[in-house]
């Protein structure tokens, strides 16, 4: 079983405003894209981040071989409780997620 980061070209996360984060998965190839959309569910992402599935928005962008997840920030960006103002560390968590072959 390989980690998501070993299968795809790049996993990136960033701000999507003060209340949302976005995680972009650049698959690189049609094969990797097909594998990711088949094996990585919104429920799996929600569980990895300790969130409810219905709070996760998923966008499959076939022409670019990209899967994008938008999720609510646990704390408002820049608040004293926000440990990652730029939202960059979320990608590392998802990249380490094991995916079935």
Describe the residue ranges of each PLM region.
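Long, contiguous binding/interaction regions
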Residues: 1-101
């Amino acid at each position: 079983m390989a980690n998501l980061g070993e299968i795809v070209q790049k996993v990136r996360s960033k701000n999507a405003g003060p209340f949302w984060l976005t995680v972009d998965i650049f698959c690189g190839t049609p094969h990797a894209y097909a594998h990711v959309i088949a094996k990585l569910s919104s429920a799996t992402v929600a569980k990895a981040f300790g969130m409810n599935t219905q709070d996760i928005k998923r966008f499959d962008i076939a022409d670019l071989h990209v899967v994008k997840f938008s999720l609510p920030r646990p704390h408002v960006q820049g608040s004293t409780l926000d440990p990652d103002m730029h939202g960059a560390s979320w990608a590392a968590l998802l990249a380490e997620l094991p995916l079935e072959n």
